[in-house]
Structure formats: structure tokens, C-alpha cells
Amino acid sequence: MAVVIRLLGLPFIAGPVDIRHFFKGLTIPDGGVHIIGGKVGEAFIIFATDEDARRAISRSGGFIKDSSVELFLSSKVEMQKTIEMKRTARVGRGRPGSGASGVGNVYHFSDALKEEESYSGYGSSVNRDAGFHTNGTGLDLRPRKTRPLKAENPYLFLRGLPYLVNEDDVRVFFSGLCVDGVILLKHHDGRNNGDAIVKFASCVDASGGLKCHRSFMGSRFIEVMQGSEQQWIEFGGTATEGGDTPRMRSEEHSPSRRINGRHFRKRSHSKSPRARSRSPLGFYVHLKNLSLNTNKRDLRNLFRDTDLTNDQIKFVYKDERRTRYAFVMFKNQKDYNTALGLHKTVLQYRPVLIDPVSRKEMVRIIECYEKKRPESLEKERPGRVSQKYSQEGFSGSGQKLCIYIRNLPFDVTKGEVQKFFADFSLVEDDIYLLCDDKGVGLGEALVRFKSEEQAMKAERLNRQRFLGIEVLLRLISEEQMQEFGIKSSWLSNERTQACSRSHDGDDCSCLFDLKDPSSCSFGQSESLRYHPKDLRKMGHFKHPQGYFRQSDRCSPEDFRHSPEDYRHPWEEHTSHSREEDWRLPLEDWPQEDDFRQCHEKDHRQLRSPWEEDFRRPSQEHFRRSYQEHIRRPPQEHFRRSREEDFRHVADEDFRQASDEDFRISQEDLRYPTDEDFRRVSVEDLREVPEKDLRLPKNFRSSGEEFWTPPDFRGQHPFVNFDHLQGGKFDFEKYKLENFHDGKFVPDLKFNCGSGGIIRVMISNLPFKANANEILDFFHGYKVIPDSVSIQYNEEGLPLGEAIVSMTNYNEALSAVKDLSGRPVGPRKVKLSLL
């Protein structure tokens, strides 16, 4: 469909060829260029398609014959009327503003232009001015061939102003006339659109302003036409009170509409150049990216050119916390446009984004952010108990003192959780690690704080990275914590222990069924039963499936993988009141029973080591032999076979041992002590050559046929690898007699021989070094291929160290002497014997 473009600023010497050359690449049909000429250099160009018209508009500001031209969307109706008036109207062309050759009379044909606009994809400049009638009313009159010589009201509308114009420039343009006010119209983004409405002191001054029609302001000509009070009020002006100024009004212009601008604009039939603007009618703006320290005074200073009060500013809150959003309401269009012009203005080192917004959208955003949620009610006022728990009788327990942590590593320890909350005075008894029924960690924990204020501060660590993982924190109450098997009072665990100590074995036997499958076997004939509260005191939730048999349990709401077997009442397991044992002093509490002297007694009151982070092992662990729970076997057991050593342990060997020897701790289950290694001499190991890992009978020089135990990963002749975690031994922690500062000092009495396996430590390696590079470094030396072990820290990052195993001592000593100080990549490595 053909689209008409209006061109202004065409030089006198330019012709149709120059215009076609200017629009080179765009399709202009034959006869599509119509040059009107005149002082403004007007012309109309017809383009074949909408796309060509869009591309043509983008060339506005270009040059034709060294003259800048401007392009506007137009229509065939405007073009035809302009050509017709150019040919017929010749009166008054010598005086500016009075000639019939002007385009001002075109603006009376609003009905014809509406029809053109209905099928055109563009809003032409004529269409935007269709509502400006010279009599100041909304009535459509017949076209007149001459411009009025006298103004009907003191308001004039200006078109074609430079985009950088200000009010002073307009007053200079009307020099000699009394101008009361100027309103510069703007786009929705705050930029001037080249239009303005001017209010004069009287109609006489306004009539003088009409004579400035088509006068130049700088390099641009200005169109001056009659305005109306409606337009002045609509664009931010105030209504003139009194009837001193002569005006022509219709009966529909009532004072109430002039006072209430919003109601007037809603019902007015006059059209203005801003009729197609995207600006909202409510004069609301949405401020974004504000600093959290910004207050209303700062915003008033930002909009200092507007009439703004504190009541017109609204900050947006979410869960009683300030956000970076705010809304501002302006009273008139002028202030509204001024505010939009401050888009991306820097306020407190942050660019403030100012966008127009409707009242409906503003209300929706505020309700969305400030809608109170049930879980946020407890965080609003520290120390306040929610009505829900108060009505149910939970006077103090409704406070949210606990933090529920998720997304932790499955093998996290209490000490690590305690380090995460290093800013809070927590003890390990305040931390509970959740495990499944097999003893495997769930990656979840419960932490209790002394006050609700501390818990709220700890919740700020939500989504912080811990051990390389982003953890999730949630504030919960003690009632919600009970759903995990934790009593509302944190002292309930200690009370349970006191009660259990005050009972003897016969009194406590009623707590469990004799056929309870949760009995934990420590040997072939002995069985020990653990009370669940003992394990809960340790901070873990591992529980066999046979402890409790309640059928009315259900999963707690809003939590994942919660233990379910600890929701029984506390009173079920005690035969007397809670306060009975607490009335006794600490020194009068009954002593613990020693299960080594009486195997038939119930040992639920077994004391757990508070200083160690003990995670209860799985149920299969308690079916193992005594060797799993004995820290220091007799010396002669080293000369027996492994099966004989741990299956036939006489009871008399342990009856006279101290209590400390039988305290179950994490160290007893995983690591031997220094004394174990010092008691084992080299001569003792030589007596059992088939158990000497350095001299196996079936050893061969090939790395593929090298015999090692199944758990072997870091061989040392003095270590029983069945007790080590992951088959590794910490040489730094457990330094033996021949190890000084991490270096191997050979024993002259010990015959290393050629069949012994020697470990070599490589230090100062590049962090990106791999096993192949290390093997290439030892090229020519007898290194066991699969023995290269690169050391990593707790976070999984390389330490720049590695350990390799060599076939004999002489080969290792030669490698240390020859290769120490040589480079591996950019670094010089250091070798030492282990």
C-alpha cells in the first residue's frame, strides 16, 4: 500500500531527480514526487510499500544539495488538500502568518483524516493535529481559506520547535509580547517532541503571536496556530479563574471539569498531539534500581523541579524489608514529563530507572510484594509469638529459634556446621545431623540458637556457599522441630539421660520388647540395646526400623526426608516425673554400670563422647567381632592370623581395663593410635614374613602383578589397613619412629633389600600435573605404574604434592639424588623418602 512522506527543507535548486537520488534504494513510483516549494521547501513523496516508508523516515536529517531536510509521515488527503490550496489561495502571501498557502488550514479536516488513518499503519502529523480547532472548541467547522487575524483565546500551539529548545527560547521567539507560561510537550521517555503550548497575558498578545507563523527559530521554521484552554489544562497548566479573558466555550466546558483534570480528560472530545502517547493517565512513575539508603528527601531533591510531597512517594517493601523499587505520583502532566526526562539519572552512585506505569499495574505490584505470607509473620517482630501458637497454648515455644539446613554434603560433620555459623556461639549439642535408616547422611541438619534474633541473623546466610555447595536455610519453630524427633525444650535430651541413669537395668527393660530386632550384637553371645535418646543426644538420627511401632505417624509438612521415628511422647520412657531427677545435685546421680563386668545388664545409659563428632554406624556394624570396638589388643595378637586374632578374645583380657579403654569414639573405629605403632617392632614383623607387605612371597617386578591388599592405596609396613578410612594413612598425623619432619631416616639394622617397596614424596608440583607427567619424570626408574597418588586438600584442590612407590630402596634413593631439583613444567620439584 502506498505511503506518503512529507519533506521539509528542500532547497530551491533541488528537483525530483535530487529527491530520488536521496532516496536511492527505495521504490518511488512514477509521478510519486510532488514539490510544493515555498519558504519551507515543502514536498510530498509517495512510496510503494510500508517498508520503504519506514526506511525513508530513518533518513530524516540528511542533506539534499547541502541542505538538511526533515521527513514526516503524511497522507494522500493532506497532500491533495495542500496542493489544492497552493494553487487557489494566493491572498496575503507576502506577510508571514496570514497567507492562505500555509498548511494550518489543513488541520480542520479531521473527519477526512480519520478515514485515512483507519487504513494507514502510521499516525501522520496531520492526524495528530486534527483536534486543534481555531475557535478553541471541540466542534468541527468547515475549512477556511485564511488564517484568523485575531486570537480567540490567549493560548497558542507551536509546532516544529528544535528538540533542545527551552522556555527562554520560546519567550525570545515571542519577544515584545507578554507570555505568561510555556509548556514543552515531551515523548513518553522525557524527550522534547518539538511541540509546545504557550499562554499569553491577553488575546491581543496571542494575536501578535499568530503573526509569527512560519518564522524561523534558529534553522527551523515554527508553525503557530490557535490553541485552547483544554489543551493547556491537559498538559499540566492551571485553569484561569475569573472571566476577564474573553473565551469562546461550549456548554460542555464546566468548571468542575477544569478543576479535575483527570475527569476532564476522560470525557473530553478534543484531540491533542499527545492523544496517541503511551503515557499513563494517572501520572505515576515506577522507580527502579534505587539504593537501599535512599529516602523520600533524596527523591524530592531528584525531582526538585516538580511539586512533590512525601505523601506522593511510596517505597515497596517485601517481608518488611526495603526493595529497590518505588512509585511516585505527580499532580500534573508537566511534572510527569519532567520526571520521565530524568531517566537513568545517577542517585547515590546508582542509575535510577524511571518508567511510566498505570495505577492498576502499580497497585498490582505493591500487593504482590507486600502480601504477607504465613512464614514471614514470625520474622516481622523478634520475640513475638504468632497468634496461631498462642491460641493453641504454646506460649513460648512458638518462637522460631531453629534453622533447618538443606543441600549439605552427605558426610558433613558437626564441626563443619559449627564453622559455618562461626559468628554465633554454638556448641555441638546445638546441632543435629539428619540421617536415614541406614546411617547415611541426608545432607540436612537442624541448628538451634539461643534467641530468635540470632536465628534471624543466621538465616541471612541463606544461599551462601559452604564446602563448595550452596546451602539452603529456613527458619522454623520448635513445634516444627518436634516433627523431626526433637523435643521443644533443648534440655529434654539431658533430662532423658538423667532419668535413664536413675533407673537400673530392670526398670529400663520395660522400654523395649525382648524380641525387639533392634538389639545390637557385639559378639556371639552378648547383645547390647541402645536407647534412641542416647543416639539423639549424639546429634544423629540413625534408627533401625524396629525401634518404634506407632502407626499414626505422618511425614512433617514442608520438609524433605524427615525422620519419623522420634515423635513419641517423652513420658512413655520414664516411670516418674521429669523434675524428679533434676531435683538431685549432679554428684548424687547414680553411677553408670560397666557392661564389661555384667553382660546381662541393659546399657542404654552408655555415655557417649561429647567431645567427638560421632555418627552412629549402621546396624551391620554392630554384628562385627570385638576387634571393631577394641582399641588396643594385646601384643601377642600381632603374631596370630587375622581371623584368630579377632574371633577368640578372652573376656579376662578386658575385665581389668579402665573405662577409657572402652569408650566408643570415632577414633576407636577408624584410626589406630601412636602407641599401637610404637609397640610393634620391626623384629616382630620379621617373624611373620607372610604378613610383611614389603616382602610378599608372590612379589614380582612387574607393576601389573604387584600384590597388595584390597584396601591398599598408600602402603606402609607398620599399618593395619583394615582400620584406616578409605585405605589411607595420614603420615603427617601419625609419624613413626623413623619419620622425622616428614623425611625417612633409614634404620641401619633394618635390611631394606631389593624387594622392599619404598614410597617417594614429590613436592612443589604444578597444580595441573597429572599421573602421566609424573611417570614421565621418573622415566628410567622402576616405578610401580599404578602407585602414583596426587594429594588433594579437603576442598578437592591439588596440594602440589604426590606420592609414588618404587620397587626397592636403592632405586628410590637414586631417584631422590638424581631427580630432586629438576623441573616439572615451570616448577622445580623436591623429592624425599617416606
UniProtKB/Swiss-Prot annotation:
Spans annotated as Disordered: 237-277, 546-572, 621-643
Start-end of Basic and acidic residues biased regions: 244-255, 550-572
Classification via SUPFAM superfamilies: RNA-binding domain, RBD
Gene3D superfamilies listed in its UniProt record: 3.30.70.330
Keywords, comma-separated and alphabetical: Phosphoprotein, Repeat, RNA-binding
Highest taxon of the lineage: Eukaryota
Record Pfam families: RRM_1 (PF00076)
UniProt-recorded name of the protein: RNA-binding protein 12B-B
Gene assigned in the entry: Rbm12b2
